[in-house]
Amino acid sequence: MGQQVLKSSNEKMEKAVAAYSRELATVRAGRASSSVLDKVQVDYYGAPTPVVQLANITVPEARLLVIQPYDKTSIGDIEKAILKADLGLNPSNDGTVIRIAFPALTEERRRDLVKVVKKYAEEAKVAVRNVRRDGNDDLKKLEKAGEITEDDLRGYTEDIQKETDKYIAKVDEIAKNKEKEIMEV
């Protein structure tokens, strides 16, 4: 029983770190990345559709994103959706493709982005700690029910703490790398 709680906690912590990584992908670091458009939904024939399903997105240069719609009639809708998504990007449309030039980040904007990264990191750590708390609560319930011994409880609690420390260190490492990427000129 205790092993199941341990396994479940481990999986949930892994998911929390993966969600954090996905969240960080949307924080742009001065370099063009198609992941900034992941959450952009285009109103395509009345249905909200992700832009990645409507167009080929390429990064020909470090600060340029080119969006080539499969259906040329959707180019205006894609452009509107990008503007509406409020990503701080200015798409330019030449009739066949949409180009998005990423401006160089100012020092102030870089610092703001680092703050955002730290905020996301703290949220991810809280999520990992919440999983630890839930796992420990489940273990205490098992001990009260007599399904595991007090010694087992202590051992499993230590195991969950080790996993928690491992995942928090992983979050810190991801955050440190992203901060370094943002502050790179």
From Swiss-Prot:
GO annotation, cellular component aspect: cytoplasm
Subcellular location: Cytoplasm
Keywords annotated in UniProt: Cytoplasm, Protein biosynthesis
Segments passing through the bilayer: none
InterPro entries: Ribosome_recyc_fac (IPR002661), Ribosome_recyc_fac_dom (IPR023584), RRF_sf (IPR036191)
GO BP: translational termination
Main localisation: cytoplasm
SUPFAM superfamilies: Ribosome recycling factor, RRF
GO molecular function terms noted in the UniProt entry: ribosomal large subunit binding
Role description: Responsible for the release of ribosomes from messenger RNA at the termination of protein biosynthesis. May increase the efficiency of translation by recycling ribosomes from one round of translation to another.
HAMAP family, A to Z: RRF (MF_00040)
PANTHER family membership: MITOCHONDRIAL RIBOSOME RECYCLING FACTOR PSEUDO 1 (PTHR20982:SF3), RIBOSOME RECYCLING FACTOR (PTHR20982)
Record-stated family: Belongs to the RRF family.
Name the UniProt record assigns to this protein: Ribosome-recycling factor
